[in-house]
Amino acid sequence: MFNFIDNVQTYSKEALQAAKYIGQGFMVTFDHMNRRAITIQYPYEKLIPSERFRGRIHFEFDKCIACEVCVRVCPINLPVVNWEFQKEKKKKQLQTYSIDFGVCIFCGNCVEYCPTNCLSMTEEYELSVYDRHELNYDNFALGRLPTMVNNDSMVKGIKGLGYLPKGIIEGHIDNQ
């Protein structure tokens, strides 16, 4: 008789323990149900990068003096600078400048050490192509200014990059 009562007691304790664990799981689920979705509908919602975001490099051909500092400070010697020495001016004349963004690690050393500030980082991060050879940008492609996400009326901008704290969940879509 006492053995039966002990079995019922242990069974009821285990059932209560299991119900407690199931309740804790439901509480986590209900906690996440109150939050807004963080999923980004990519073509229609885009991230607005921060000020220090390192995107595609913009190049200004007229400012470049062909000093090749960018090549020397690049960890992978990536920029290709072709120049010709002009004897009458006793100066280097830049002919072509190219960067292969399929290899670039976007470290920003070339931008930081450029003495004439002809290189700058843009907020363009959409560099996907079907052929990797299309990522080799010459001085004409590097000189093209990117379209700003803020200026596109068809796109909603997302304020933060990635992590949103629990208290700042509402209103993370930029209503412009």
From Swiss-Prot:
GO terms for biological process: photosynthesis, light reaction. It catalyses: a plastoquinone + NADH + (n+1) H(+)(in) = a plastoquinol + NAD(+) + n H(+)(out); a plastoquinone + NADPH + (n+1) H(+)(in) = a plastoquinol + NADP(+) + n H(+)(out). This is NAD(P)H-quinone oxidoreductase subunit I, chloroplastic. GO terms for cellular component: chloroplast thylakoid membrane. It comes from Mesostigma viride (Green alga). Residues 55-84, 95-124 form the 4Fe-4S ferredoxin-type domain. Keywords: 4Fe-4S, Chloroplast, Iron, Iron-sulfur, Membrane, Metal-binding, NAD, NADP, Plastid, Plastoquinone, Quinone, Repeat, Thylakoid, Translocase. [4Fe-4S] cluster 2 binds at residues 74, 104, 107, 110. NDH shuttles electrons from NAD(P)H:plastoquinone, via FMN and iron-sulfur (Fe-S) centers, to quinones in the photosynthetic chain and possibly in a chloroplast respiratory chain. The immediate electron acceptor for the enzyme in this species is believed to be plastoquinone. Couples the redox reaction to proton translocation, and thus conserves the redox energy in a proton gradient. It is a peripheral membrane protein. It is found in: Plastid, Chloroplast thylakoid membrane. Its EC number is 7.1.1.-. GO terms for molecular function: 4 iron, 4 sulfur cluster binding; iron ion binding; NADH dehydrogenase (ubiquinone) activity; quinone binding. [4Fe-4S] cluster 1 binds at residues 64, 67, 70, 114. Pfam families: Fer4_7. PANTHER family: NAD(P)H-QUINONE OXIDOREDUCTASE SUBUNIT I, CHLOROPLASTIC.
